Amino acid sequence: MNSRALRFAGPAILAAVALVALVGSLAFGGGAAPLLVGDPGPVVRWMLPVAQLAVNLSAAVMVGALVLALFGLRAGERPFEAAVDAASVGAAIFTVAAAATAYLTFLNVFNATPSAGEVFGRQLGDFLVGTELGLAWLLTTLFGAVLTVLTFAFRGWTATLLIAALAVVALIPMATQGHSGDEADHNIAVTALALHIGGAAVWVGGLLTLTVVRGHLDRERMLALLRRYSSVALAVFVVVAGSGIARATVGVVSWEYLVSPYGAILLTKVAALLLVGVLGAVYRLRLIEGIRTAATAHRFWWFIAVEFAVLGLASGAAVALSRTPPPVDTTLPLPAVRTPSEFLTGAPLPPEFTLQRWLTMWDIDLLWLFVVGFGLFFYLVGVWRLHRRGDRWPIYRTVLWVAGLALLAWVTCGPMNAYQDYLFSIHMLGHMLLTMAIPMFLVVGAPVTLAARAIHRRTDGTRGGREWILWAVHTPFAKLVSHPLVAAAVFIGSLWLFYYSDLFRWSLYDHLGHEWMVAHFLISGYLFVQSLIGIDPVPLRYPYPFRLLTLLGVMAMHAFFGLAIMMSNALFVAEWFGSMGRTWGPTPLEDQYVGGGIAWSVGEIPTLILAIVVAIQWSQSDERAQRRADRHADRTDEQELKEYNARLAALAERDARAGR
């Protein structure tokens, strides 16, 4: 299969197999069956999933092409331009498909008859801006339109990176669709679906982009690109598989689900993904090197065509699965009246928080579980690389990095994540650990220094992990936020702004707000600690006395913040914490008082440790400076001291002559 044929055959195979799989799965599972009440008609029932499939595939092209361009190609050259061109086309199709999905979803939900009348237009407008479902698709369409313009207009390194970040954000509203919003474990379902969509987009879109740029690269450069894509694909396969398992665990209530049409489609999708994983392992381990010769290269690209077919099967089954109603478990009791906790959080009230539950209660946050897992894996791989080539890496840095990640996992996936929606004090304890304790461990682990030493340097003008990390560290924005004064201001200002504004309310009501809160406070704490005791390079490092003064100021503001909460008689987000219906533990106001005490006392402990570390580093810095001065004096036979004494003697002699 030549380059031109594969450029068109790859997307055609993917789209055709996906469409056939979609139609077959819908017919088998009843996802497009007529509704007993309010049926919108066969056109809407069949065209809506087709439009959703177009959204998914075009999103994959848009995201995957940008990611592959950033990590595998060189800006300014024709292959890079071709990849971004593919992203532009994908964004344009994504916009049209999202708009069509929004329109068809409106017809499906409201059973409206299309017309050019004012009433129909007003109903459509109310749906798009007045309902969560309509707003999600409206935002998706607007994101697509903006991305279409940006991908056509900008092609540099930085611009493409920002556009790629926006493209990933554009996928978030899609994660609220399907069955995710209806399930009891809503947060897990939404997070799993978001990770699943994002990972699949990078995987499928990257593979499509390989066929697009193949004709613009010689065999050696194509071989290098395939290796880089293979590494990225391996990482996203882990994400797609892990999130898919979590998503299926939420959706499949019992094993009987698997013998239903819903279960059959689910198993088909799982089998297709596993097969793609096997195919990926085969070409990673055995076939990539074969593109050096024409005969084996021909076999390799036919192998890729087969992978497109299997990915099409998985893509079609995935869309059909989101439209197929799961079986009803008749053995479950009828739902009782919803409790206040279920009304607010979507989950029943957990059991009383006891000492035992500090170690036994878990509530997994899939996003941070992946962050911890990848952070641990890549760090240990970096240490192993240094050890293998004979370089030394202090063991204490590795131990502290692992301890920091373990503490992060415990905070985001353990008892604090399970009880923070119900107890303000637990929420505050988790916040203090995120901003103060965890960053201390991670900063001393020096991940940037390790990455700079362990990741292979690119010599062909492309950018890999090492190049992007070093670029990020030296950007003007990084210089601004890592400035000690700015880092301290963001660190302490965020504390007050978050709790005394609607941001706190947003983090409770919206899972996206919760994830933003965790990321923001972890990063702000990391930047603050890095500016004080960091080992990694920073644009500006203030003198030690100034660092201690900064810490004293932060300690004072922390104390004021904690005291303000303890002295307050007004309950934070009273309609949440005051309406939870807890029958155990302290009252909401008493619990808030405890939370204020935690902010004052527990928050000061890491600050005190930081002050001790800064003082120790100051002392060690003075000792190193003295040793350098002593070595310099030994090398020069104390020539500077002799010259200084000679000048003093000359001045004394001159003064003596003047006195006579």
Segments predicted by a language model, with ranges:
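Alpha-helical membrane segments of multi-pass proteins
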Residues: 1-660
